[in-house]
Amino acid sequence: VGGVADLDDKLLDEVTALNEWPVPIDGTFEEDFLSVPPEALVATMKGHQKYFPVFDKTGGLMNHFITIANLESQQPEVIREGNERVIRPRLADAKFFWEQDGKHRLFDHIQKLEHVVFQNQLGSMFEKSVRVAALAADIAEGIGGDPKLARRAGELSRCDLMTQMVVEFPEMQGIMGR
């Protein structure tokens, strides 16, 4: 397919343990899904479907994956089509959440953090963000950085927790806020 599969050791061990006669089969998905951050697509492929994503020589995610069948089929295209059909709704979900979250600024989520407990004695995630923002500004000032920019980064640092993408794909925490 012109790329290299990400043969994650942990996933490879898991997949080979699940299959008595492992046979790799390549599959594809619509290129339109590549508009979603690659981390979300990879999380879907590896975490939810146990597929190996394929990357091009520059490290960009391709619209290909490798799945492992449990037999040498006389009709591998049937297995391929079945796996392509299974991943499509999961990728569509990721795309939907990405597009919905894109309709709002990240900062729009900050007030929702008031309803998320960080720790009983330490308050909410909102209060933690306020403390982190103040600390970041102080540190930036002390090292000759931009305190205003550091404060803003601290304020935004937890906002992605309230995005639909992170609610659906918790492993995207810290990535969606970029």
PLM regions: where:
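Amphipathic alpha-helical "coupling" segments that flank catalytic cores
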Residues: 1-178
